[in-house]
Amino acid sequence: TDQQTKVNEAQDAVTAQEKVVIQLRTDKEQAQTKIAQGSKGFFEAYGYTDTLKILEEQSTTNGGYTNIGAENDATSLENFKRALSMVRYGNKLRTTDTNVPGLSDLTVNPTLFAISQVQLNATANGKIFGHSQLYRVGENIAAADYKSNDELLFNGWYTEEKQVYDYITARGWTKDDLKNDAAKYKEVQQALNQKYPQVGHYTNIINKDYTTTGTAYIYSKDPAPDGWECNAGQVFDFFQYSSYITATNTMTIDEFEAQFNEYYNKLMNADSVLSENQTKLDSLKADLEKQK
């Protein structure tokens, strides 16, 4: 009968939705485990096996400084997420630079994110703030006693150093002159009102040979062993000559961020998706009762 058909359809809908809810319950339980794995969980989900080796090599279990997924570690999902906008901010400065016009955006590669993360962890956990040099890549690092935003980070790495670069270039000086000639160094200090004039971070950002980058960020309420609450880093490489990356898995920041957000949002929304579907199941059960 029509009535029986309606009952059967309602029963089928309930059965199907019950399966969905059971799966979502499992997803929710696994989400907490995956969140705790930080960037490792993300790299595993997308099959970035070379990248996982970097985390493994530098993990605390192997005597390194990377405590995978910990809140005050660059591999935590929140710190990873925070670091992504640094790529875009740096690219905007790079591609509009007046000294080297026509530069293209740096692409990204998961392995360079991992290298940036483990190197920044080594920096933050060192006795003093400095480059860890664990891998052969270019690197900019910065530290602050507050939660630094991209503008402030790149103000130090780019804006202030471009002033120095422009000043010495206008006088026909090189960066070696700046380093080795005390009188010239002092002149730049006074002219630009900069305590430590330098150009190395700026020249990394505008280096035409670099093709690919990865970034990392740490903020912890208590200062890290290097004395700073905030540590940030960006590494640079060229996949033609790199020991770590190839064109495979090298992509735009937009493509990478889409992957990251899909993974992150699924984990973070596991709770609400479960409760939405539980509500849907309850209303389907109520419909079934009405049909009987």
Model-derived regions, located:
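Long, non-membrane, amphipathic alpha-helices that form coiled-coils
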Residues: 1-38, 253-292
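Intrinsic disorder/low-complexity segments
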Residues: 11, 32, 123-125, 143, ...
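Short, well-ordered surface patches within globular domains
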Residues: 25-138, 146, 202, 207-226
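A general marker of short, structured functional hotspots
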Residues: 42, 161-163, 181, 198, ...
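Structural motif detector for alpha-helix initiation sites
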Residues: 108, 149-150, 253
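A well-ordered secondary-structure block
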Residues: 133-243
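Non-catalytic cell-wall polysaccharide-engagement segments
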Residues: 225-267
